[in-house]
Amino acid sequence: MKTTIQVLVLIISFLNLFGQKNGTIKIDDNSFIYWEIEQFDTSKHTFEYCLESDLKYLCKIDKQDWFGSDRGLDFPKNELKKLEISISQTRIPLETSQMFNPNFSGALFESQFELKRFKDHYILFAFFSDGAGSYSAHWKIENGKSERIVLSIEEEFFEWQLE
């Protein structure tokens, strides 16, 4: 028993040392979200800067627009590395590219997600924010596969929270 506890403490310490957090969120009796967030590592990415009104800012990470900052004046603090949904015990990966600073605490919570069932598919709605740079993502889930259909800062994509 003592050895098991020591091993668990060692694993948790190791993960925290490298800035990795993960967890599970229960959506309903048949649906769960599994997530993994890592500390942002500048050595693993490429960067492009833009200039607007004499303001230089980080506009692209790995040649793509990125989400999680109001203007890209700083590097992201962390990165959403993995997101999966389990529906009726079928685990389905969700696209997480371009998604940074998903929450101020570095963890995700049930209140950030809503799963809606339609006739032949589901839509998973989510919002992410670390206090600045809020964005919304929507995934269509059908036949054991997912497609991210929205990744946006536009207000219209947050309206699902008002329903």
Question: Which residue stretches match the model-derived regions?
Answer:
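Sec-dependent signal peptide recognition
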Residues: 2-10
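Hydrophobic h-region of N-terminal signal peptides that target proteins for export
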Residues: 10-18
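Exposed acidic/polar residues on beta-strands and adjacent loops within beta-sheet cores, strongest
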Residues: 20-163
